[in-house]
Amino acid sequence: RLSANFKNTIFLLAFDPVVIQDYFKKNLKIDSEFLEKIVQKPIPLPTIEQQYIDQFLDNRIEKLFDELAISKERKEKLNKDFPLIYQTQIRKFFKTLRRVKRYVNGLSSTLPPIKSEVNLHDFLILEIIRNFFPKIYNDIWGNPWSYLAAKWNIGYFFPSPFVSNLEDDKKYEIIKAHIDSITKDEKDSELLKGLLKGLFFEVENALEQHQLGQKYSVETCRVEKRITHPECFKKYFMLKVPSSDISDEFVEATLDLWHLMEETRKEDVISKTIFELQEKSIL
């Protein structure tokens, strides 16, 4: 700046002062206050009100849902279920527009291929974990018995530590120890636990020391495509329907077709559909 005294010229620097000062101190062994000699007129970016961040996120998600032709019924269900966990947990993660854009960009890639097979509430929460807590995201996939009701599916139950039919108290003690262990080094560990409780009632049972079995039945979780149901769980991570499964989208469309069909044709069409699925070894 001093050796280039050009007229009508302004030198504009965009930088993170904390990062620069830390670099001076650790790498150059220079006092962090040396930055003041270089930049005489710092102008920090003004902070943005949280309500504008919330609105920006809401608008971007709504735009994505419109592009994906998400039904009005599903959006209304989300608007009923999502605000509580957003206000108490999620909005604390989104303090900058950069974080919102990163999250929505990820969501724009992961949701489209599986949009009809997942619960929107659960998928939006899981996407936060995938973006900001990748270690936890990988642990959910690698250790599903610490999150799911493993007894609902023998494929998850037999490899689990609970195959010896432990008492619930002992089982939840193991789950709590596991969750505490993997979250302890995370920056926002308590907020993260709040998200996990919002997704997996077994985690809530373990951390809060109460049981929600009556609230979350196997039938309800399957109908609502909740991540905590073993038949839905894989879809959230594979972003596709397993080759051995019939997609929910196909089942729903087929049932709607049968419902609208004339009674005289219904039996033949149903038989034909079942035969085709059997030929593909899916049914």
In which residue ranges do the predicted regions lie?
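Sensor-1/coupling segment of RecA-like P-loop NTPase cores
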Residues: 4-28
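The feature marks long, low-complexity, polar/acidic/proline-rich intrinsically disordered regions embedded
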Residues: 5-9, 21, 47-283
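A short helix-turn-beta junction within AAA+ P-loop NTPase domains corresponding to the substrate/partner-engaging
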Residues: 27-46
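Intrinsically disordered, low-complexity boundary segments flanking structured domains
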Residues: 25-33, 219-224
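Conserved P-loop NTPase "ATPase switch" module shared by AAA+ and STAND
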Residues: 1
